[in-house]
């Protein structure tokens, strides 16, 4: 008996919608990353993108535990000398709530071209509406 390896052209991808309201950031992000990679499927193959599309709604209502609302910092660099910028969770969730979930999930995906392809299948939106109703996403309880 041979080991099954998935082919990119035969992978069946589904669309799922996840409601982030009241969810803990890390627990939500790990399950999303797992599904983007396709590790929940029996035909998972490490070198093939077997994951599903994930649409996250209500990104502004995601929660963190402890004092992370004020203590958790997000960093980026402008590219100029001394151009390190930082913003805490509380300010970032008010400014760009999508980036909080995107950053958490991106850190859990592989840092290579395959991981970037997986990351492109993540769609995060503030509020309860999203433009992917034509794909008929199934609701995913996490």
Curated annotation (Swiss-Prot):
One of its GO terms (biological process) is translation. It holds the Pfam family Ribosomal_L13. InterPro entries: Ribosomal_uL13, Ribosomal_uL13_bac-type, Ribosomal_uL13_CS, Ribosomal_uL13_sf. One of its GO terms (cellular component) is cytosolic large ribosomal subunit. CDD domains: Ribosomal_L13 (cd00392). The keyword Ribonucleoprotein applies. One of its GO terms (molecular function) is structural constituent of ribosome. Keywords: Ribonucleoprotein, Ribosomal protein. Belongs to the universal ribosomal protein uL13 family. This protein is one of the early assembly proteins of the 50S ribosomal subunit, although it is not seen to bind rRNA by itself. It is important during the early stages of 50S assembly. NCBIfam families: rplM_bact. Part of the 50S ribosomal subunit. This is Large ribosomal subunit protein uL13. The lineage of its organism: Bacteria, Pseudomonadati, Pseudomonadota, Gammaproteobacteria, Pseudomonadales.
